């Protein structure tokens, strides 16, 4: 996977709507080439590459955690209300402040994190079992989606701006916007790595994990917070980017097995490579028209989702 990620990095760096030779790109990287090339590479392509890497890592680790602690192989940030919370906050902000498009990332982050805290409280009040987390998330998602639909009916003029956010994309992202999300994603990844042995025991079942000394409710709650914080961080700069948190954990487990300490780095690498490749394809295949990475991920993820559903029915 490291080789695939490196290849993805090179493709993202050298390909774009503006054609440049490899020599031009390398000179621009070091600030010694033509000014227009330096701007394209250093101000546009590099921040976008970093955003794609962070989005891939954040959503993949979030999905892996959610699938591990809930015991549901279809769990993802979408299902526990993170994306719905972000979407509701975004459309509410647009309805109250129609010109505040620049505030959408911040509002989305607050909405996603508020949804996370609510899910944690709900799950904790009913002993944070893996079933209660999923049910609480589904209920919250349904309520928030109803709220989004209601606001859309009352304020139809906000639909266009909201749709741009809900599709998910990395166009126009800057390095400054990535600082806080990067810190949250790295901290979540580090804490997950520390808790990997206990998460692996949690995958054996609550009773067996408890008999082995794992504080089941505490570990599940911490993992839920890490997963949601990581996903919320991605939402703040990439919008509602779907399917990554669903499909990448399955790819990682097929490559290295289900042990969390092996699946975690594999998921991070796979997710980073997948989103980076998807974004590169989206901005180059139909150049100069750009296809948002959210659409590319949906084209890849929807068939994969159907395969998972069919596989689950056969196992059932």
Predicted regions and their residues:
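Alpha-helical transmembrane segments in inner-membrane proteins
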Residues: 1-316
